[in-house]
């Protein structure tokens, strides 16, 4: 299986399966000399980990990260950084009834046809469990970017199923299980309680933002920053759509509205989402993700087995009724990995380029 490594200079290779002994990643290309400990990584893993509320899977994994290499006396050495997260709460017996059949909407069918076999335990390699190493690697990228450029990452949920979530303040996001930017989440609690009792699942919309991104990241024509962001975000489990800036709303805009006016004191708007011509402008990078409903649900559905015969599928086990609830820290990590890689690439080719006129300030839109 190829397709497990992302990045050109900051390369991350992800390994493991949902019910294997461990999952992890190897980071190659991290600059030397940065202070790094497990604690620097664990904070983001704790934001993503399962079992933190009744609205997510009750699989109780501590997701404790171990740094196996690439750090000496508390600093990165420039050699590959190996990160390991041990699986401790697998329950493979829950998947015995679907070992010979395919879950509608799941990767089961495609994996089986492509590779000739599949690991049904928790989805194997296709499981969202494999996003934990991504978050770990993203934490390393976040730390370097924060120290080098002051870049910061944050994400929130802007829609849960049919329910839009109005934006009030980023300050609310850490204080509720939905990563919602609102003070009162009772309506979303009630919605998820009813959904879980019905045996169904729902999708979500996630907003991801990077602030303090330097001007100049991205390599046209085919390695544009926004192209790489979209590419990597589509690799996140259950993502079915990616928008940069105004995204699909651009269709209904006029050029007089969509084009972000430039003034000596800053951009007047940010419909471009921080990227023009595939290159960062210094504006906030704005990304929106559409996440489909979870495919592993207890409601009976029609499918076929590995012999092509009709069957009924009921998925047991512990699953997220909405995978979007835990997607915010994962999306932050993926955005950080793309920006980190492009920052190193920009430094390698254009690090000596100096403009007499400083970049204009970014507009703050919330």
From Swiss-Prot:
Q: What pathway is this protein a component of?
A: Metabolic intermediate biosynthesis; chorismate biosynthesis; chorismate from D-erythrose 4-phosphate and phosphoenolpyruvate: step 7/7
Q: Which domain of life is it from?
A: Bacteria
Catalytic activity, reaction form? 5-O-(1-carboxyvinyl)-3-phosphoshikimate = chorismate + phosphate
Q: Which InterPro entries match?
A: Chorismate_synth, Chorismate_synth_AroC_sf, Chorismate_synthase_CS
Q: Which Pfam families match?
A: Chorismate_synt (PF01264)
Keyword set includes Nucleotide-binding:
no
Note on cofactor: Reduced FMN (FMNH(2)).
Q: Where does NADP(+) bind?
A: 48, 54
One GO cellular component term, please give it.
Answer: cytosol
Q: Name one GO biological process term.
A: amino acid biosynthetic process
- Enzyme Commission number(s): 4.2.3.5
Q: Which residues form the signal peptide?
A: none
Q: Where does FMN bind?
A: 125-127, 237-238, 277, 292-296, 318
What CDD domains would the database entry show? Chorismate_synthase
Cofactor(s) it depends on: FMNH2
What does this chain do?
This reaction introduces a second double bond into the aromatic ring system.
Its family remark reads: Belongs to the chorismate synthase family.
State whether it acts alone or in a complex, and with which partners, per the record.
Answer: Homotetramer.
Protein name, UniProt field: Chorismate synthase
Annotated source species:
Acidovorax sp. (strain JS42)
Q: What is the lineage of its organism?
A: Bacteria, Pseudomonadati, Pseudomonadota, Betaproteobacteria, Burkholderiales
